[in-house]
């Protein structure tokens, strides 16, 4: 049994295909198949049911695959521990950011980080929270920037900042007459929401928890978007309102800002944090990323303050 064989096993289990696994491992498919077959012969069991499409893990193979993942994670720790003790910031660091945060930090963060740490190669991507958690567990990512708290098993969380939510109204909405608004001013009949799968959608529904009936019933069609900027454009073109993270407004022109309203205390905020698996040890690299993100965030958001309410991510409503 070799580490390489275990890597091939985990790859096939992840991608459910010998061809895709070979591509990800940068070897030919016959080479990968031969090594897995040799391991199966040594163990005296079949790890995969090759008659099914996609490839399925056998009942005996399930436990072997999980143990292989654990062994590979422990092997990776050896290199990481050496780097941590040497305090040498180098190598590849793979992280992903959720779509409602990425546009407001990634463009500046990547160049800023590269200038500060030229020996570290960042691999950044944009994924939804569930995809980030899966990629972390599969060893495809080192960290993720998401809305927290998640309270997921085997996931560690490190808060980064607390971002207020604001409301953006069409020019004819009566709530614009107020300086500060209440959650009851958010009409779910006329709201534009992110689609299911986005944490921010659940947070907005949590904000309006006392009156969730009649979602988008005030118009002849229902539309939900995957992009915050699209929500703003729907308000501009079709009226109504939406709820935005404050960072999304920082480059708004003055006429857009006139239609932004903040909430009365307790001001609704989202906690944004960085997450890793519980076996991650490259803490110096993680801290360097956290430090660079912090430089991009207004000081007022860096700590949780009185008069703010962190909205829940999980919501049973709608």
Role assignments for model-derived ranges:
Residues 128-141, 146-147, 197-260, 307, ...:
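Hydrophobic hinge/microswitch elements
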Residues 10-28:
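Short helix-boundary/capping micro-motifs
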Residues 152-159, 163, 178-179, 185, ...:
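Beta-alpha-beta core module
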Residues 190-213, 282-291, 297-311:
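Secondary-structure junction motif
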Residues 90-153, 217, 224-227:
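Central regulatory/effector-binding core of bacterial HTH transcription factors
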Residues 40-59, 79:
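A short LG(V/I)-centered, amphipathic sequence patch enriched
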Residues 9, 21-22, 58, 113:
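Hydrophobic two-helix hairpin corresponding to the core of helix-turn-helix DNA-binding domains
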Residues 42-43, 64-86, 289, 293:
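Alpha-helical linker/hinge and terminal dimerization helices associated
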């Amino acid at each position: 049994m070799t580490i390489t064989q275990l890597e091939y096993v985990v790859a096939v289990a992840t991608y459910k295909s010998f061809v895709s696994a070979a591509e990800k491992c940068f070897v030919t498919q016959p080479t990968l198949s031969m090594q897995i077959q040799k391991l199966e012969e040594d163990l005296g069991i079949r790890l995969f049911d090759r008659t099914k499409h996609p490839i399925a893990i056998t009942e005996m193979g399930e436990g072997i695959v999980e143990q292989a993942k654990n062994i590979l994670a422990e092997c990776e720790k050896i290199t990481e521990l050496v780097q941590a003790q040497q305090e040498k910031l180098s190598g590849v660091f793979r992280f992903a950011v959720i779509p409602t945060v990425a546009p407001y930090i990634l463009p500046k963060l990547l160049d800023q980080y590269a200038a500060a740490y030229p020996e570290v190669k960042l691999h950044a991507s944009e994924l939804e929270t569930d995809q980030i958690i899966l990629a972390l567990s599969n060893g495809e990512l080192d960290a993720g920037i998401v809305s927290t708290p998640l309270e997921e098993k085997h996931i560690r969380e490190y808060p980064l900042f607390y971002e207020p939510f604001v409301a953006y109204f069409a020019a004819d909405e009566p709530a614009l007459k107020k300086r500060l608004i209440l959650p009851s001013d958010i009409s779910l009949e006329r709201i534009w929401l992110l689609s299911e799968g986005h944490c921010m959608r659940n947070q907005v529904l949590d904000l309006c928890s006392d009156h969730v009936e009649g979602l988008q019933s005030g118009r002849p069609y229902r539309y939900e978007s995957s992009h915050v900027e699209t929500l703003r454009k729907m308000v501009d073109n079709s009226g109504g309102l939406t709820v935005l993270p404050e960072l999304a407004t920082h480059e708004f022109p003055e006429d857009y800002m006139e239609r932004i309203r903040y909430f009365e205390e307790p001001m609704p905020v989202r906690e944004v944090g960085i997450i890793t698996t519980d076996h991650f040890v490259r803490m110096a690299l993680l801290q360097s990323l956290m430090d660079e993100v912090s430089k991009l965030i207004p000081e007022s958001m860096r700590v949780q303050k009185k008069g703010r309410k962190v909205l829940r991510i999980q919501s049973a409503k709608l």
